[in-house]
Regions:
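Conserved phosphotransfer microenvironments
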Residues: 47, 57-85
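Two-component signal transduction core modules
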Residues: 66, 94, 115-116
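Helix N-cap/capping motif at the beta->alpha junctions
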Residues: 29, 43-52, 77-78
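Conserved sequence signature across two-component system core domains
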Residues: 10-11, 44, 66
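A generic structural motif
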Residues: 28-42, 61, 92
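Receiver (REC) domain switch/output surface
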Residues: 109, 125-144
Length: 144
């Protein structure tokens, strides 16, 4: 039976959401090719919609890793969503992203594992964080 790696991306910018999702997919492709794992990648550009689906139990909240923008629009920030995620997926890797470096200092009450500044390297960096987390959690090498 295949182990499932569940990844959540919440980024309100559709272009960046796609770039991040693609980088994450590419980062785990070597492991998926070995056949023992499968990836379930859920992506949202609207955090309110995600919260509604979790609260209505339309979606489960049992992620291996979460990549989330700090500013989500509609008065929401990553802290609101991470709190909900941690209730259900306590050991999930949480990578918070923002264009503003100062967000890291502002968000010291938000439980995240890594903070990534959104630049041209951020999607690849997120992919590397996921690779490292999977290698450690499942004792598997992602080397090609």
């Amino acid at each position: 039976m295949k182990k499932t790696i569940k990844v959540l991306v919440i980024e309100d910018n559709e272009y960046y959401n796609n770039a991040l999702s693609n980088a994450i997919q590419q980062s785990v492709n070597p492991m998926l090719a070995k056949g023992n794992y499968q990836l379930v990648l859920r992506s949202f550009t609207n955090a309110t919609e995600y919260i509604r689906k979790i609260k209505s139990k339309e979606l489960e909240c049992d992620y291996t890793a979460v990549f989330i923008d700090y500013y989500l629009g509609e008065g929401l920030n990553a802290g609101h969503v991470i709190e909900l995620i941690k209730e259900h997926s306590g050991d999930a890797l949480v990578v918070m992203l923002s264009q503003e470096k100062t967000v890291k200092e502002k968000s010291d009450q938000v439980p995240y594992d890594y903070f990534v500044v959104k630049d041209k390297f951020a999607p690849s960096l997120c992919g590397l964080y996921l690779q490292q987390y999977i290698e450690n959690k499942y004792s598997v090498s992602l080397d090609q």
